[in-house]
Regions:
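Hydrophobic alpha-helical transmembrane segments
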Residues: 1-5
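N-terminal topogenic membrane-targeting module
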Residues: 12-77
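Secondary-structure edge/capping motif, primarily at the C-terminal ends of alpha-helices
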Residues: 53-61, 80-91, 115-126
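Short, solvent-exposed segments of well-ordered alpha helices
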Residues: 60-67, 71, 91-102, 157, ...
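Short, contiguous, well-structured surface segments enriched in hydrophobic/aromatic residues
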Residues: 66-84, 100, 107, 111
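Short, charged/polar, low-complexity loop and linker segments
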Residues: 78-97, 147-161
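Soluble C-terminal extramembrane regulatory/interaction domains of multi-pass membrane proteins
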Residues: 100, 104-194
Length: 194
């Protein structure tokens, strides 16, 4: 009897969008009932995920491997794409979150489309050949080359042919996530300055 009442209560709660139901696994023990509205559930999920993604808020070209930054940005893009499904666009609060989420997807997509393939192709070539040709000239007027595996990643990356544009676009993403996303999702970005 009690189980039936709980089931009816949950069923009507989900229909009225007072509660959200999230299936972790499709097994008997994997059913989690979360007593939150979709906007709170979504905000918590996004905050918890982004809370560990420093490079989207602050990038350090001297120590951050751009290859790993692209992986992280792609993970964020996919995470938002999947999690956005919980939002009910008929509700005002959900619609606001849907708007900022679409803005995140658009900005991430633009950066990844513009830079990811070219950088990865360049990086694969130099790592495979173990040499980076620089624009610097030696005393004979020939280009200086660096041995890939003996050079810190921060120095290697500065020789990427679109380094300045890539850094400018990373900084735009950082600014957007710091000024807009961190505010909406209540993400503590001050910790990255310590």
């Amino acid at each position: 009897l009690i189980l039936s009442l709980i089931t009816i209560f949950l069923f009507f709660g989900i229909l009225e969008k007072k509660y959200s139901l999230k299936l972790e696994k499709l097994t008997f023990g994997g059913l989690n009932v979360l007593f939150d509205s979709s906007d709170l559930l979504y905000k918590r999920s996004v905050r918890n995920f982004l809370d560990t993604k420093r490079s989207v808020f602050k990038i350090d070209p001297h120590f951050d491997s751009f290859e790993e930054v692209f992986n992280s940005l792609y993970d964020i893009y996919n995470f938002i794409r999947v999690e956005i499904r919980v939002l009910d666009v008929k509700r005002k609060r959900d619609m606001e979150l849907y708007g900022i989420s679409n803005k995140m997807l658009k900005k991430l997509n633009q950066l990844l489309t513009k830079h990811q393939n070219n950088y990865r192709r360049w990086h694969k070539y130099i790592s495979t050949n173990d040499i980076v040709l620089t624009r610097d000239k030696d005393s004979n007027g020939e280009n200086v080359s660096l041995i890939y595996h003996l050079t810190p990643i921060g120095i290697i990356q500065t020789h990427y042919y679109h380094f300045s544009q890539l850094m400018a676009d990373f900084e735009c993403i950082n600014k957007f996530f710091c000024e807009e996303v961190s505010v909406v999702f209540n993400i503590d970005i001050a910790k990255w300055d310590e």
